[in-house]
């Protein structure tokens, strides 16, 4: 049975239905240490293929019966096969999704909304990444439904290259973000110029 598929359902509230209290945000009920190649990034010393992006990320979770990160992680493990955005920026999108879902959710009707607004520094290998000046406006809904439970993710990522000083994108290895990056098979490698820097290869 195909558990991950696009549905006609949406996360919009039904205006005619009785308002319901959203379920509590999930606990970290599925914690584990990510693979060792996900090393924390420090200040990037290399100037090759490094770009600053002003980022706006949002993940809205719709689940009438509540949700856990076990289900979210299950959905994100198939992210590569359902991603509909610019393939040159899939690595950036994965990073932003992980960082966004590491924040605190805000209730919005029956939904929980995670938001991220930051200026971040990304470094790609020479053959990967966006073109000079390229921007991204990505929006997609991914749903999971097994006839007894429904979870929908509405993902929006806007990224514009900018000259504002930003921070490198990796966070504590033990964080939820690194777990989600591993689930989405984020592809990185260690920089040849800086042993403390990871480089995106997608």
Swiss-Prot record:
Q: What is its main location?
A: virion
GO MF, one term, reads:
structural constituent of virion
Pinpoint motif PPXY motif by residue range. Answer: 35-38
What other note does the entry give for this protein? Answer: Most abundant protein in the virion.
Quote the function comment for this protein: Plays a major role in assembly and budding of virion. Completely covers the ribonucleoprotein coil and keep it in condensed bullet-shaped form. Inhibits viral transcription and stimulates replication. Plays a major role in early induction of TRAIL-mediated apoptosis in infected neurons.
User: Subunit arrangement?
Assistant: Homomultimer. Interacts with nucleoprotein and with the cytoplasmic domain of glycoprotein.
Full protein name = Matrix protein
Native source species: West Caucasian bat virus
